[in-house]
Swiss-Prot record:
Functional note: Nucleotidase with a broad substrate specificity as it can dephosphorylate various ribo- and deoxyribonucleoside 5'-monophosphates and ribonucleoside 3'-monophosphates with highest affinity to 3'-AMP. Also hydrolyzes polyphosphate (exopolyphosphatase activity) with the preference for short-chain-length substrates (P20-25). Might be involved in the regulation of dNTP and NTP pools, and in the turnover of 3'-mononucleotides produced by numerous intracellular RNases (T1, T2, and F) during the degradation of various RNAs.
Name of the gene this protein is made from: surE
Gene3D superfamilies, A to Z: Survival protein SurE-like phosphatase/nucleotidase (3.40.1210.10)
Protein name: 5'/3'-nucleotidase SurE
Residues given in the record as a divalent metal cation binding sites: D9, D10, S40, N93
NCBIfam families per record: PRK00346.1-1, PRK00346.1-3, PRK00346.1-4, surE
Catalytic reactions of this protein: a ribonucleoside 5'-phosphate + H2O = a ribonucleoside + phosphate; a ribonucleoside 3'-phosphate + H2O = a ribonucleoside + phosphate; [phosphate](n) + H2O = [phosphate](n-1) + phosphate + H(+)
InterPro entries in alphabetical order: SurE, SurE-like_Pase/nucleotidase, SurE-like_sf
Entry GO terms, CC: cytoplasm
Keywords: Cytoplasm, Hydrolase, Metal-binding, Nucleotide-binding
GO molecular function: 3'-nucleotidase activity; 5'-nucleotidase activity; exopolyphosphatase activity; metal ion binding; nucleotide binding
SUPFAM superfamilies the record matches: SurE-like (SSF64167)
Length: 254
């Protein structure tokens, strides 16, 4: 039976992870290791300035107190889950992780940590907060496909599911990340003691939502599957940077 480490960034009791855990447990061995609270936007942060403790809930799920999604996967793979899991699944996230969202997403970061530790990894997000069961069924289908036809690309699959009943989903599309306009909104107010308080505003509007993007696929009713990689090297830019250094007469010396 496939051993799955299931995590998220919305917190261990969030509806997305609980619906997905219930669906996966029908056919797989699932261990939930997730933050004890909402850690959306935590990206790939690791906790290095203090110790971490865990709490095992009545249903066997493990919450990491004050931990990030990356902490949860790191601890789960390296210490808490025995035998070692065979795949990391992150989600179901409440809301999409499209375009630039992947930079900040704790959901994607949890999957990325799983891949960094040598495991296949899926990040699952729902473009809303109603049809978690649809996203759970899509995840089960993807896992069945991975078992019958293994994917050897070594990538993270970032999966975004339209917030629709399953029968209204049109199919799968392999996509690239689109992009958003830069977010600039900041909300502020003054507390009774005169201190200024600030809240970061919503993400920017869509900028690149062309036909091959994750934005377009989800908007048209398709499940978007975007392969992501841990290696952030911009290989096509290496020659440009070498030429730039040569023109600046640096020649590789400081």
């Amino acid at each position: 039976m496939l051993r799955i480490l299931l995590s998220n960034d919305d917190g261990v009791t969030a509806p997305g992870i609980q619906v997905l855990a219930a669906a996966l447990r029908e056919n797989y061995h699932v261990q939930v290791v997730a933050p004890d609270r909402n850690r959306s936007g935590a990206s790939n942060a690791l906790t290095l300035d203090r110790s971490l403790s865990v709490n095992t809930l009545e249903n066997g799920d493990i919450s990491v107190l004050g931990g990030t999604p990356t902490d949860c996967v790191y601890l789960g793979v390296n210490r808490l889950v025995l035998p070692r899991p065979e795949i990391v699944v992150s989600g179901i996230n409440r809301g999409p992780n499209l375009g630039d969202d992947v930079i900040y997403s704790g959901t994607v970061a949890a999957a990325m940590e799983g891949r960094h530790l040598g495991l296949p990894a899926l990040a699952i997000s729902l473009n809303g907060e109603l049809h978690y069961q649809t996203a759970a069924e899509i995840t089960c289908r993807l896992l069945q496909m991975l078992q019958t036809t293994p994917l050897r690309a070594g990538n993270i699959l970032n999966v975004n599911v339209p917030d629709l009943p399953l029968e209204h989903i049109k199919g799968f599309r392999v996509t690239r990340c689109g992009s958003r306009h830069a977010a600039e909104e900041v909300y502020s107010m003054q507390d009774p003691k005169g201190n200024m308080l600030y809240w970061l505003g919503p993400p920017g509007d869509k900028h690149d939502a062309g036909p091959e993007t994750d934005f377009a696929a989800v908007e048209q009713g398709y499940v978007s599957i975007t392969p992501l990689q841990v290696d952030l090297t911009a290989y096509k830019a290496q020659a440009l940077v070498r030429d730039w250094l040569a023109k600046a007469e640096v020649d590789g010396e400081c």
